[in-house]
Amino acid sequence: MPKTGTGRTAVARLGDIVQLGPHRLICGDATDPIVLRRLMEGDPPARLVLTDEPYNVKISGHVTGGAHREFAMASGEMSDEEFLAFNVAWIEAALPHLCDGGVLGTFIDWRGAPTVAAAAAKLGLTPLNLIVWAKTNAGMGSLYRSQHELLPLFKKGDAPHVNNIELGKRGRWRS
């Protein structure tokens, strides 16, 4: 097994698929349509694609003091144009596996959110919302540390998305 930047042995290998109940997770390049076809093989299109993409922010010296290795790509080396192309590539690769009315979301920071939104718009997705994940502690690294991550959500196609929450269905409560 290959070593990570921390000297620890990597557990997942490129191409590994892990079964998580009825869900699957693949270790691979999300911009590669073949990887996603292999992951989704035999399944109907998904109602949700949820990712935690690299933010195109250098890890070493910015996010941490050296405990973690850099991402394989989009780890601060991409220009704005390259990061937009990266986002277009992974979203475009995911779209054939997302049903009409399906929701796509990716965790990102404030620097990358406009780029994700531009890529989604370029591919015809409809913005649904911007969710803020408020964490209990701020991240490490810079003077202005974020205590949140952003989760922009987009919808594919014209069909309604599935609403399992049903807010307001049984009355409205205001706080």
Feature names for model-found ranges:
Residues 1-175:
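Core catalytic lobe of class I
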